[in-house]
Amino acid sequence: MKVRSLLFGMLCMLALGVSLASCSDDDDDSLDDGGSKVTLPQTRVYILNEGSKGANNAGLAFYAPNKDADFISDIYKTQNNAKLGDLGQSMIEYEDEIYIAVYGSNYLTKLNAAGVELKRVSFVGDNDLSAGIRYIDAEDGYIYASFWGGAVAKINATTLEVVDKLTGLGDNLEGVAICEDMLYVSNSCTADYTYHNDVKVIDLRTFTLKETLTVASNPNTQMLEEDDKVFLISDDYSSAEGYVLQMIEPAKGNKVTKIGNATYMAANNDILYLVNSMTDWSTKPVTTVNTFFTYNIKTGQMNNASFLKDAPAELVSSTLHMLTINDNDGDIYISTSDFITNGTIYRFKKDGTFIEKFDAGGVNPNSAVFFN
């Protein structure tokens, strides 16, 4: 009887241990919502509304794709009792935290998964970085940021301390992407809009400039990494077919190849999703035609068939401001803007089926991050 009792007790303790371990694992999977004033579902989308220059009206909208919470037009203001600032330029998610570069106000902020501000760093008083933060990427515990004025900063992702800077890289630095321990940075133009045609390659292991690549004129904001390659759009105003889409291949000595024309791009599962917006400025009012298509990175084949199904008719002729994809489920998000009133977000399934459209909550929605 004592043996049976002992065995029973051991089994109970084992079961309790498994139960406690399971609960602990669940807790580890949860997001950091510390300090939140609202209850949020685990699946959530944040949309950065850039705002208008000088209007101090940048904002961060919250959207629940599973319809288990109400839309919040500016969750940053809700959570922090403050405005985000002037011109929200770019946003990334890194290690379940949100980083936003606010260009006009010239600072970088770190938020938890509920939009509560954890830290911020201002660059206003730094002579090397005072021209304004632009685009950001992250790797191995650091945020890398481009700045107008020709600088790149290496920032500790935890403390937001600037641990290193590279200056004299060019003029108005824009889009950034990390591939194979290298940071690729677009050198767009001078302050008076004399356009450059180069991309800077920085070795992140030493944080030194490795080389300068020649690309089409005015490499700009659109740059990303997919399948160990870097894709870049140059806003070449001399190109009659539209802005120039290029591929940089690190495995081939950073070979640069033009692969088409596009205005916006996003990537998922080795497919590049593209839109080419052609505007006729001679008409009153101006007219725009948007063409949606894809590029298979593995095969190198362009597919001119639209990746959208039953899209609202107005999307073909609207002014676009964002194309992004939720890596978790493949849903496609496209924004439109008139640069004055609130933008509109169009959401599609991975297969291109239209789901819905909704008010973006602010002016010029330019990026989104996803938590699932």
Roles of regions detected by a PLM:
Residues M1-L6, M13-V45:
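Bacterial Sec-dependent N-terminal signal peptides
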Residues G34-G35, K83-I92, D128-A138, D171-E180, ...:
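Repeated scaffold domains used in trafficking and secretory/extracellular systems
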Residues P41-V45, E95-D96, D140-G141, E180-D181, ...:
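Short coil/turn segments that connect the beta-strands within blades of beta-propeller domains
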Residues I47-A55, I100-G104, Y144-G149, V185-T194, ...:
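Conserved beta-strand positions in repeat-built beta-propeller and related beta-rich domains
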Residues G54-F62, N106-K110, A151-A153, D192-K200, ...:
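Structural motif
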Residues P65-K67, N112-V116, N156-L160, D203-F207, ...:
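Short loop/turn segments that connect beta-strands within beta-propeller blades
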Residues A69-K83, E117-N127, E161-T167, T208-T214, ...:
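A short beta-strand motif characteristic of beta-propeller blades
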Residues E161-D280:
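Acidic, serine/threonine- and glycine-rich low-complexity intrinsically disordered segments
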